[in-house]
Curated annotation (Swiss-Prot):
Site-annotated residues for Interaction with the consensus sequence C-X-S-X-[PA]-C in peptide substrates: 132, 240
A Pfam family matched in the record: Glyco_transf_90
EC number(s) from the headed UniProt entry: 2.4.1.376, 2.4.2.63
Gene Ontology, cellular component aspect: endomembrane system; endoplasmic reticulum; endoplasmic reticulum lumen
UniProt-recorded name of the protein: Protein O-glucosyltransferase 1
Organism in which the protein naturally occurs: Homo sapiens
Disease with which this protein is associated in UniProt: Dowling-Degos disease 4: A form of Dowling-Degos disease, a genodermatosis manifesting with postpubertal reticulate hyperpigmentation that is progressive and disfiguring, and small hyperkeratotic dark brown papules that affect mainly the flexures and great skin folds. Patients usually show no abnormalities of the hair or nails. DDD4 is characterized by prominent involvement of non-flexural skin areas.
Top-level EC class as recorded in UniProt: transferase
Subcellular compartments: Endoplasmic reticulum lumen
Active site: 133 (proton donor/acceptor)
Keyword vocabulary terms for this entry: Developmental protein, Disease variant, Disulfide bond, Endoplasmic reticulum, Gastrulation, Glycoprotein, Glycosyltransferase, Limb-girdle muscular dystrophy, Signal, Transferase
């Protein structure tokens, strides 16, 4: 073999193949240049937010309350209550009162937990809190009226609040979550443990999704999975509305999968449901790369999560999903960095203290726009912390 080391043939082959290899590298780099440039621009423009006093989300509160800077009158509030756009609450003398009716008691209980956490520092006020899935105040409605909702699009004036699901009343998924997903602080710990068991290098590189067909926007991913199962593993599960295989695109429903078991996969998909999806925040804590489909529906913390910085944005019709998956597979280090930034953001800025802090800041700012003194309504029940309810 010594002749090969100094052979003119070897030199000729090296000179012949080197330009070809360089060309392939250049071609590969240029193929993904649009995505790489987009990531670099997004990182250059990104300003990390402070962890102090949940100030990360102050801009959301300011924007949501802007329509009410002219003041909220007693007459306006009476109209909101009359129209039954949500559950009416009053705070007087650091006590919380509520009308008798609540459409979803566990959801109201989840909301009340956080208000009671900060009740001692809140001024008198009253508000209507919508615990339905859908926002109530479209922008074409004039004048804007104050209704609190957990999720909305840019077409609504609703005031976003941290959803009840951070404490209780989350979506029940039979049989794995029969009473809902449970407390966010405890679920965080489970997901972080699972992420540690499945570091990036051990994760399956097939894209993954399990969920019910709450929106047909999910259909293209399911169909892509059936066509190319090595690229995507996506199946529909049952929900309460399931009646036949028509509701799962002609195939039997898949078994539900615990969210902690999603951490085995590098690429996880988040879609809107009826409104914003409750799974979004959970997926990040797997340390996986989140593919977020569409950008219309928001919860209060969404605006600080930035595309290309914390997650991969996907067009609503999924027309670019195959190209995006090919990109992250070809640029594994880049994909891992985005996944790590997304995970760190949720770990650092969406702790339970941040939720409580947001509630306090939101209600304190909102109360400044009430142009009248609140009078407690007769017949309203005082809401007492659950730990005290065993006294009787």
């Amino acid at each position: 073999m010594e002749w090969w080391a100094s052979s003119p043939l070897r030199l000729w082959l090296l000179l012949f193949l080197l330009p070809s290899a360089q060309g392939r590298q250049k071609e590969s780099g240029s193929k993904w240049k649009v995505f790489i440039d987009q990531i670099n621009r997004s990182l250059e423009n990104y300003e990390p937010c402070s962890s102090q006093n949940c100030s990360c989300y102050h801009g959301v509160i300011e924007e949501d309350l802007t329509p009410f800077r002219g003041g909220i009158s007693r007459k306006m509030m009476a109209e909101v209550v009359r129209r039954k756009l949500g559950t009416h609450y009053q705070i007087t003398k650091n006590r919380l009162y509520r009308e008798n009716d609540c459409m979803f008691p566990s959801r109201c209980s989840g909301v009340e937990h956080f208000i009671l956490e900060v009740i001692g520092r809140l001024p008198d006020m009253e508000m209507v809190i919508n615990v339905r899935d859908y926002p109530q105040v479209p922008k074409w409605m004039e004048p804007a009226i104050p209704v609190f909702s957990f999720s909305k699009t840019s077409e609504y004036h609703d005031i976003m609040y941290p959803a009840w699901t951070f404490w209780e009343g989350g979506p029940a998924v039979w049989p794995i979550y029969p009473t809902g997903l449970g407390r966010w602080d405890l679920f965080r710990e489970d997901l972080v443990r699972s992420a540690a068991q499945w570091p990036w290098k051990k994760k399956n590189s097939t894209a993954y999704f399990r969920g019910s067909r709450t929106s047909p926007e999910r259909d293209p991913l399911i169909l892509l999975s059936r066509k190319n199962p090595k690229l995507v593993d996506a199946e529909y599960t049952k929900n309460q509305a399931w009646k036949s295989m028509k509701d799962t695109l002609g195939k039997p429903a898949a078994k539900d999968v615990h969210l902690v078991d999603h951490c085995k996969y590098k690429y996880l998909f988040n879609f809107r449901g009826v409104a914003a999806s409750f799974r979004f925040k959970h997926l990040f804590l797997c340390g996986s790369l989140v593919f977020h489909v569409g950008d219309e529906w928001l919860e209060f913390f969404y605006p600080q999560l930035k595309p290309w910085v914390h997650y991969i944005p996907v067009k609503t019709d999924l027309s670019n999903v195959q190209e995006l998956l090919q990109f992250v597979k070809a640029n594994d280090d880049v994909a891992q960095e985005i996944a790590e930034r997304g995970s760190q953001f949720i770990r650092n800025h969406l702790q339970m203290d941040d939720i409580t802090c947001y509630w306090e800041n939101l209600l304190s700012e909102y109360s400044k726009f009430l142009s009248y003194n609140v009078t407690r309504r007769k017949g309203y029940d005082q809401i007492i912390p659950k730990m005290l309810k065993t006294e009787l």
